Design a protein with these regions (language model features):
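Short, Lys/Arg-rich flexible segments
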Residues: 81
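Residues embedded in well-ordered regular secondary structure
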Residues: 1-75, 269
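Acidic, glycine-rich flexible loop segments
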Residues: 6-31, 46, 128-181
Length: 515
């Protein structure tokens, strides 16, 4: 600072006494990374128990595990820091009949993380050692200073034998710049516990319907995924004291103290940061697999849906699908896949909430043709081409974007700004009952192969993806009176207008061998 023409921040007396350690409470040199505050290691233990058994019709397995982990901090509330987790997981496999089987899976997790309301590690990396003395002995108080004694004696945070200091009683020190600190927090600010509870459950049955039609089967499943978390905390505030040092009879004593803050202790645990999430899912599907000579057929008829409830959000996230896939190949040489999916979205207006997404793929295994079959170094060579139109609402960010919106708190206007101003009722968006799904149209052609006893593999794919119908409010395609700048108002709706294209080539090359 002297080089800049400013007065020195620290006097030579401050520097000397800090280095000499003559009075660590007046000239602090606070340490963080010592054995007074930190353990050399932290403990962790794990316990796991497994149970299994069953008979002809049912088999079960259960796993119970628990772990608890301590912390490096070893003083104040920090020595009580811990993390623990209890997990119970089990499943039951059922053989109901020769043609029917089922299962039940369940998992529950209980997780807790307890810690002090002190940001010790942050302070250790940022707080300068000479900024503040966190604890000051009561013995330095002037016994004739009634005002200072009264302030200190009224404090509820007189710390007995704090870590790293000689035995005795201490009050919480401070300065005007640092009225609280991480060490005082550790003894007087309280603690918090973050709690998480999770539960997953699924059950299903599977039926072999070959007695009705060869290769036919059916399975259905229901699942629940639930989680909740919250924080409980004891949030105390506390008084700290800045001191004015003086010299009396050759000894350094405290001439006066200044109180910062107040002692507040309710004794009541606070609950905050509560969050909850629940997902319910169901699926049911028929599968058909059969071969007729060189003709191989595979088909799936699938219906599924899920609904997700999230705390703090009004709308549930819902998804429902009905899909059909038919796959055919001739002698594993020529392939054709046809698929269709019926999708539903509550984000769209009535009449436009359902759509069909078709997909088709063709494949040709060139390596099985006569003109390549005898090429010894060629193990596999396939040519594929596919086209898909996917109707999706992932890019529709909110519900009711097809609705018109008015506000009663629009632009201020009037004859007098002081007495007669009122707000207009303005349109903020027009409605559009024709709003539809965003379509993702994808065409791809690929060549895949394996060479030299399958040691070398490669894949080359060309793709051309067009996303059509992205939502926008293009006011420039509407008459100018549909949008005004004063008052600020618009009747322009969201429409399916945006379009983008992504095209390119992917190439991958792999090699594997035994050494």
């Amino acid at each position: 600072l002297a080089n800049d023409g400013l007065s020195a921040k620290y006097s030579w007396e401050d520097i000397y006494n800090t280095a000499a350690g003559t009075n660590p409470y007046r000239y602090p040199n606070q340490k963080f990374y010592t054995s007074d505050y930190l353990r050399k290691n932290k403990s962790r233990y794990d316990v796991t128990a497994e149970f299994e058994g069953g008979g002809k019709f049912a088999q079960f397995y259960t796993n119970v595990s628990y772990y608890r982990e301590g912390d490096f901090l070893n003083f104040g509330e920090g020595k009580n820091n811990y993390t623990d987790r209890l997990n119970v997981r089990g499943n039951i496999d059922l053989q109901l009949a020769d043609w029917a089987s089922g299962w039940v899976n369940a998992n529950a997790t209980y997780y807790n993380q307890h810690g002090s309301n002190s940001e010790f590690w942050k302070a250790a990396s940022t707080l300068r050692p000479n900024r503040v003395a966190p604890f000051i002995p009561l013995s330095y108080l002037d016994p004739m200073d009634a005002n200072s004694l009264a302030l200190i004696n009224n404090s509820r945070n007189i710390i007995t034998n704090p870590a790293g200091l000689p035995a005795g009683k201490y009050f919480l020190g401070a300065t005007q710049e640092d009225q609280t600190n991480a060490f005082a927090d550790m003894y007087a600010a309280g603690y918090n516990t973050w709690t998480s509870r999770q539960m997953q459950f699924d059950t299903g049955v599977k039926f072999d319907l070959s007695s009705l039609l060869k290769g036919l089967s059916f399975k259905t499943m229901f699942a629940v995924d639930y989680s909740t978390s919250y924080t409980t905390s004891l949030n105390d505030s506390y008084a700290t004291f800045g001191v004015n040092w003086t010299q009396f009879d050759g000894k350094q004593i405290i001439g006066s103290v200044t109180q910062y803050g107040e002692d507040k202790h309710t004794g009541t645990l606070n609950s905050s940061n509560s969050a909850e999430r629940q997902t319910l899912a169901w699926t049911g599907q028929f599968d058909y697999v059969n071969s007729f000579g060189n003709h191989n057929v595979n088909a799936t008829l699938l219906a599924n849906g899920y609904q997700q409830t999230i705390s703090g959000e009004y709308h549930k996230v819902s998804n429902a699908n009905l899909g059909l896939l038919v796959s055919y190949n001739y002698a594993h040489k020529y392939y054709a896949d046809l698929a269709a999916n019926v999708v539903h979205s509550a984000k769209l207006p009535e009449g436009n909430r359902n759509a069909i997404s078709p997909s088709a793929t063709l494949g040709w295994r060139l390596s099985e043709e006569n003109f390549l079959k005898d090429v010894n170094w060629l193990n596999d060579l396939r040519l594929t081409a596919g086209y898909t139109v996917l109707n999706q609402d992932l890019d529709i960010s909110e519900y009711f974007m097809y609705k018109n919106i008015f506000t009663a708190t629009g632009t201020w206007w009037g004859w007098s700004d002081a007495n007669n101003s009122i707000q207009t009722s303005d349109s903020q968006r027009g409605g559009n009952d024709k709003l539809g799904f965003i379509k993702r149209k994808e065409f791809n052609v690929g060549l895949n192969g394996a060479l030299f006893s399958n040691r070398l593999s490669f894949a080359v794919n060309y793709y051309n993806t067009v996303t059509d119908g992205l939502l926008a409010q293009p006011d420039y395609i509407y008459p100018s009176y549909m949008h005004t700048y004063w008052p600020v108002s618009t009747f322009v709706p969201y429409i399916n207008y945006g379009k983008n294209r992504r095209t390119g080539v992917d190439f991958s090359l792999g090699y594997k061998d035994k050494v």
